[in-house]
Amino acid sequence: MDSRFVTYFASAISASVLVTTIFVCWNVTHDLNTLQAMSDRNMQDFKAISDRTWDKMMFKQQSSPPSPSLIFGRNKRSGDKCNCSEEPSNCPGGPPGPPGEKGNDGVDGVDGIPGFPGENGGAALDQPADGTCIKCPPGPRGPPGPQGEEGPSGDVGEDGEPGVPGNDGADGTPGKSGAPGGKGPQGPPGTPGRPGQPGRKAIGEAGPKGPPGAPGTDGRRGENGTDGDDGVDGQPGDEGDAGKDGTPGEPGPQGEQGTEGQPGTDGAYCPCPARSISKVAIQ
């Protein structure tokens, strides 16, 4: 019994360790795949940003204005010109060249840096023309213009017409039964039914005891009862307090004379001689 329990316990631990290992391996593989996908996406974003930056640099280089030396310089030009007189400075230009091809939609550019301060203005180089104008033949047709810049965003188009109503959808599944409805209003009284068959006389069982009836009226007053017997004598009460002293009584009658008293003792002035019976008798 003990060996079998140990075997089952070891098998359970091995199975749990195996499942945990498989889960950890799958989690690590998933994290690596996620990291690789994020790296590829970042590389694609970086490549797209670098391509757009390179296109902007090329476009800026092609559409950059000429240098100040080309604007303010005095470069001589040779070619077909009017040799009849001095070359005027106010001849009309040739016809405009054909419009260039429509440029591709460019990407949104980044905000440019603030421009440098402009140079101080100088005196105009053109000489004022005199009253006489020598009309020269128009110059040759100019070359096609450079590719135009990206046009502004077009206005929002108008709302399209409402589409054709769709087909009716399929019938939905029956809904759950609703809660019982409230009690409806009382209907009108029905028509009286036909009289029933005569009933058979039957004696039913006694019904349950009914509730108590109402109290009856008061009865007549009863006659007076006979006198009761005398009660038993009560026990003597506690001893009362002493009464007050009475008034003094009247003096009683005078009493009879008493018998002669015994001889008294000697005085304290001096001792007397003893008395004899005969002397006492004489006195």
Swiss-Prot record:
Regions of biased composition (Acidic residues) lie at 226-240
Origin species: Caenorhabditis elegans
| Biased composition, class Pro residues, residue ranges | 137-146
Query: What UniProt keywords apply to this chain's record, in alphabetical order?
Result: Collagen, Cuticle, Disulfide bond, Repeat
- Give the multimer and partner information: Collagen polypeptide chains are complexed within the cuticle by disulfide bonds and other types of covalent cross-links.
Region entry Disordered, spans: 59-283
Q: Which protein are we looking at?
A: Putative cuticle collagen 79
Compositionally biased tracts (Low complexity): 253-265
Q: Which GO terms describe its cellular component?
A: collagen trimer
Q: What does this protein do?
A: Nematode cuticles are composed largely of collagen-like proteins. The cuticle functions both as an exoskeleton and as a barrier to protect the worm from its environment.
